[in-house]
Amino acid sequence: MNVCMMSAGMFYEQLLHQTGWSADANGGTLESLGYKEGFRVDVDIPDGTWAEAPSFHDILIFNTGHWWWAPSKFDPVKSPMLFFENGLPLIPALPPHVGLDLVLKHMISFVERRMRTGGIKFFRTQSPRHFEGGDWDQGGFCQHLQPLLPEQVEELFSLENNGTNVETRLVNQHLYKALQGSDFHILEITRMSEFRADAHPSTAGGKKHDDCMHWCLPGTTDTWNDLFITHLNNIKFQN
């Protein structure tokens, strides 16, 4: 009898890499430019919570994006992202979308070098939010009983409209560009999920504001799992 052992794991890190920075009393390049605190983003150093995962697990699914367009957390003045490469700050300071490109470039390369033989790598596209009338801290809501119509989807997510949830498609643009030429598989869950404004906890989430980001269970995420299993079966068939 043959026994097949497969290992998969879950790791949480907001930006895929090492973070955290505060001004040094002795001064430095960033200090001389007036920076006092922020989030150090080492674009070429993976966070320790997952750095060893590629050499151990058989299947890895990555995603990133929401936090890169989160001014409530990464305020460009009070707590900006400060990008480092080879241990040195990148001057002039990079905007988040340029930093994201660098992080994706380095992290994809890192995983491809470290992934165990036969390992399968996925990058999941963005899980869309559905805030209407403002962001989560601005009275945004998502009180729907039915999936959205195509024109409603475009109103919320179209890059031309620059709506509250525009980061969903923006991040996907950067992700698809970064994955060109790699051997990652893409788990495309964005388009199907954009219609499901009715599938969030909304006012039933137990929070002071509508929860239009997380998903009810069971529901949309079960379809993601079905899609994932289909991908695995196709990979098995091709091999």
Predicted regions and their residues:
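A compositional signature for long Ser/Thr(±Pro)-rich, low-complexity
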Residues: 1-239
